[in-house]
């Protein structure tokens, strides 16, 4: 039987960023091959650093998919754990080591007997940076294994162990990366009339762009425009010719995201025109669409977990965090949910360390749900 804690700790020590998960893939394949030995109803494919494990059903009417992400983050771990990351500057700070371990545990249970319906276990690379789910879909990595229904989870530090949270609508916001570069004319600080100050224009833009949400977005729907990077100038007595801004747009519907993207671009171009300078606007959403749960399937999942002993189901509001599972759920009906891990540190924090007792709880809960879906 798979040792869940040992498996999680082994994976925790080898975090790798998106599309570079070579050790992670090798470890997963080794475990998967041991679990599936002698199971003639199982097929395995790889796609770059991803893995697809397909269980052929005995009388299949549909294919049920379970997705887990496998990449780490470019973070220096500060947990002090004896099994901390062995990869300098890399950490499983978003719980993907937990996701993988739970998926392996569920796979082990699913292999106890051939399911009626087909089951697909997807170990997806590059959730954090390149929208690996979108890349796999666009590259036809699924082929005829593409699920009819897709499910997945994400751990959540502010929920207690034993709590599962989701809803029947949007769970995660769609996210869009924004890069803006204003191009003016540099000069001496003493002669501003001979220059065209990109820093002033960019500063004006930062204040004006706040009106996009306050005056274009329905307050009930909500959206976020945040610029976390502002780079301009090199010294105190030189007027800079360029100013660079790097930020994010987040919205709970794709229509709202597109509206906000359009307005941000319009404001940037308007400010540039007002200051008689050039501007470059780069908007990159890619596969980070809103995670929109299928209402009927979400209600089914919520009712199932609500009746499980040891599980506290929470009907939760959407989060403004992003998840590339939204892309796959734009192609296939499905559901995502939160799994509580009770950590005082947030996701992406260098000291984030979930409680390991959630592993057994997660495997028991998810595998029982997948068993139900596989038998329908």
Swiss-Prot record:
The active site is at residues 69, 128. Its EC number is 3.5.1.47. This is N-acetyldiaminopimelate deacetylase. Disulfide bonds: none annotated. The keyword Lipid metabolism does not apply. It comes from Streptococcus pneumoniae (strain Hungary19A-6). Pathway: Amino-acid biosynthesis; L-lysine biosynthesis via DAP pathway; LL-2,6-diaminopimelate from (S)-tetrahydrodipicolinate (acetylase route): step 3/3. Catalyzes the conversion of N-acetyl-diaminopimelate to diaminopimelate and acetate. Keywords: Amino-acid biosynthesis, Diaminopimelate biosynthesis, Hydrolase, Lysine biosynthesis. GO terms for biological process: diaminopimelate biosynthetic process; lysine biosynthetic process via diaminopimelate. One of its GO terms (molecular function) is N-acetyldiaminopimelate deacetylase activity. It catalyses: N-acetyl-(2S,6S)-2,6-diaminopimelate + H2O = (2S,6S)-2,6-diaminopimelate + acetate. Belongs to the peptidase M20A family. N-acetyldiaminopimelate deacetylase subfamily.
